[in-house]
């Protein structure tokens, strides 16, 4: 497929001219001029999710021009290439087929002339059988006791994704306690080990390559701790499991080959929650619920593949994002889930988006001259309202935001959810329309009496509005709807990367830092210490590290 420089397309040039016409139009004027705006700029999907993108600084013409850009960049052809198993991850010469992991229709997906679905289904069956044994208490630890705790050791996609999903689906949780360890800081693992009993705990070592330093370091320490209690290596077979694409490395670590749940090199780490790397999810919510989770994602996959441009939700949201980053010069996008169970959702898509599209070199190897991936951040509502919404409302930054809320809560505590929904609706309304001087004048009952003081304070109270948002309403957070929602965001990221003409499925920037860390480790480790010198800052920090370390007994 030919790589296209988007700034050379006719659509991009048309958008630049159009932006001059609309950049100062206010959202309240767009709504006043079209009482059908909500109907035109919203999609109700599968009777489960409403996507309202009417509070964006776009007109019907804007949308037409953005869709023209998607067509000129051959987005639908790119989608077909991904779904067909073409090696679109060209810098690593790999296919990108996480959609196969949730292919509930079981249609053939060929890779090297072989249907990969039989392998996918075999692993799913193995996950099902094992999870049922653990959940019903049949699987015993080395002392004959049933399992009570599961520790997932991974990092990046092997941690963020499963952790986010198990938290989001906590209402579906069974009796097992699920723990996640990712940070190489020994504190993370140490605090988990204090809470668990080695006799009733299993460890899932989640690493695609089984070489990731943080994961293997934590896994070795967990194994050492476990063997101190169990005394013999034979007991590992009851307690240690690998979720990996590298079977040899897992076996060399000491994992019984029967305890390895495989995934493949065509599964990117940040999409691995759908694979065996999501075994902790299955153990938390049960395989039946995991199947519903996969089904929800599959429904969104079908929508993404088959639906035309103008009704295709991931394409529309991707285009709107590019509109802000490249024409309004917004640098960040926020995700605000108004659901406490979803408290890790923003962090997960921070990684998924920024690791995918945080690139500055295009597919031809040239430096880009436009903006690529935005900074993604967010917190659950209403906590965020009392932390950083002040800046969104009245600051100097334009921060397009996604607001996500379920209409039905899992916890009907008095009128809590009604108040949560009210805050959700209020924030998107005020961000869009603001509050003007005239509004304050109408509300003021003491204006005549305190006119001078009122006028003095008034400028500080005015909110200009015109801050763009998407509102995403789910009927309820369930395995099915969460699967849909995650797949929606995944496909949005894919479309952005394709239009921006960058490779979204590598992460070379992450790899370089890890290599340098290995070099520094050898220098500051007493056993391998060498005389290598670094830049003055790094060397100065090393010297002070050694100073503090040597003085620690006296501090």
From Swiss-Prot:
PROSITE patterns given for it? P_GLUCOSE_ISOMERASE_1, P_GLUCOSE_ISOMERASE_2, P_GLUCOSE_ISOMERASE_3
**Pathway assignment:** Carbohydrate biosynthesis; gluconeogenesis; Carbohydrate degradation; glycolysis; D-glyceraldehyde 3-phosphate and glycerone phosphate from D-glucose: step 2/4
Q: Which GO terms describe its molecular function?
A: carbohydrate derivative binding; glucose-6-phosphate isomerase activity; monosaccharide binding
Q: Show the Pfam families listed in the entry.
A: PGI
> Which InterPro entries does the entry mention?
G6P_Isomerase (IPR001672), G6P_Isomerase_C (IPR023096), Phosphoglucose_isomerase_CS (IPR018189), SIS_dom_sf (IPR046348), SIS_PGI_1 (IPR035476), SIS_PGI_2 (IPR035482)
Record flagged with keyword Ligase: no
Reactions catalysed? alpha-D-glucose 6-phosphate = beta-D-fructose 6-phosphate
The question of whether Isomerase is a record keyword is answered with yes
Q: Write out the GO biological process terms.
A: gluconeogenesis; glucose 6-phosphate metabolic process; glycolytic process
- GO cellular component terms, semicolon-separated: cytosol
The UniProt keyword set, sorted, is:
Cytoplasm, Gluconeogenesis, Glycolysis, Isomerase
Per its UniProt entry, which superkingdom is the organism in?
A: Bacteria
The entry's localization annotation reads: Cytoplasm
What does the record give as the active site? 355, 386, 514
Alphabetized CDD domains for the sequence: SIS_PGI_1, SIS_PGI_2
- What Enzyme Commission number(s) apply to this enzyme? 5.3.1.9
- Family, per the entry? Belongs to the GPI family.
* Function as written in the Swiss-Prot or TrEMBL entry: Catalyzes the reversible isomerization of glucose-6-phosphate to fructose-6-phosphate.
Question: What NCBIfam families has UniProt attached to this entry?
Answer: PRK00179.1
Its protein name is Glucose-6-phosphate isomerase
| Native organism | Buchnera aphidicola subsp. Schizaphis graminum (strain Sg)
Gene name, Swiss-Prot/TrEMBL: pgi
């Amino acid at each position: 497929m030919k790589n296209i420089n988007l700034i050379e397309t006719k659509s991009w040039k048309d958008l630049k001219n159009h932006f001059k016409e609309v950049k100062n139009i206010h959202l309240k004027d767009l709504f006043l001029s079209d009482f059908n705006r909500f109907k035109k700029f919203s999609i109700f999907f599968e009777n489960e999710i409403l996507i309202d993108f009417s509070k964006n600084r776009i007109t019907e013409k804007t949308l037409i021009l953005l869709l023209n850009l998607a067509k000129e960049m051959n987005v639908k052809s790119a989608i077909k290439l991904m779904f067909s198993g073409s090696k679109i991850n060209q810098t690593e010469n790999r296919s990108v087929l996480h959609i196969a992991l949730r292919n509930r229709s079981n249609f053939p997906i060929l890779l090297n002339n072989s249907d990969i679905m039989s392998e996918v289904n075999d692993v799913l069956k193995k996950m099902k059988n094992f999870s049922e044994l653990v959940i019903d208490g049949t699987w015993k630890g080395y002392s004959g006791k049933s399992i009570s705790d599961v520790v997932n050791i991974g990092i990046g996609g092997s941690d963020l994704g499963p952790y986010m999903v198990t938290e989001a689906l906590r209402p579906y949780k069974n009796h097992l306690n699920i723990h996640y360890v990712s940070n190489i800081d020994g504190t993370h693992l140490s605090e988990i080990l204090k809470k668990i009993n080695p006799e009733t705990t299993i460890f899932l070592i989640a690493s695609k390559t089984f070489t990731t330093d943080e994961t293997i370091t934590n896994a070795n320490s967990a194994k050492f701790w476990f063997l101190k209690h169990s005394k013999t290596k034979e007991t590992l077979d009851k307690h240690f499991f690998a979720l990996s694409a590298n079977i040899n490395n897992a076996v060399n670590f000491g994992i019984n080959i029967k305890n390895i749940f495989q995934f493949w090199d065509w599964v990117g780490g940040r999409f691995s929650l759908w694979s065996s790397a999501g075994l902790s999810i299955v153990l938390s919510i049960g395989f039946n619920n995991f199947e519903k989770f996969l089904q929800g994602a599959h429904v969104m996959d079908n929508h993404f593949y088959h639906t035309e441009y103008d009704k295709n939700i991931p394409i529309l949201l991707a285009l709107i994002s590019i509109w802000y980053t490249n024409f309004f010069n917004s640098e960040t996008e926020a995700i605000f889930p108004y659901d406490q169970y979803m408290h890790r959702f923003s962090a997960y898509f921070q990684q998924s988006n920024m690791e995918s599209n945080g690139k500055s070199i295009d597919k031809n190897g040239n430096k880009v001259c436009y903006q690529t991936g935005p900074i993604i951040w967010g917190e659950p509502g209403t906590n965020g309202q009392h932390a950083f919404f002040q800046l969104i409302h009245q600051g100097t930054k334009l921060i397009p935001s996604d607001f996500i809320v379920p209409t039905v809560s899992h916890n009907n505590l008095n009128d809590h959810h009604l108040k949560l929904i009210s805050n959700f609706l209020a924030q998107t309304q005020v961000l869009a329309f603001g509050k003007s001087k005239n509004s304050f004048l109408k509300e003021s009952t003491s204006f005549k009496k305190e006119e001078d003081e009122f006028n003095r304070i008034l400028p500080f109270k005015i909110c200009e509005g015109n801050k763009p948002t998407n509102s995403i309403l789910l009927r309820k957070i369930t395995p099915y709807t969460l699967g849909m929602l995650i797949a929606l965001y995944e496909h949005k990221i894919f479309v952005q990367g394709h239009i921006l003409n960058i490779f979204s499925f590598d992460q070379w920037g992450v790899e370089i830092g890890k290599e340098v860390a290995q070099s520094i480790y050898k220098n500051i480790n007493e056993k391998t210490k060498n005389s290598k010198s670094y830049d003055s800052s790094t060397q100065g920090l090393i010297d002070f590290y050694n100073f503090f370390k040597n003085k620690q007994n006296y501090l």
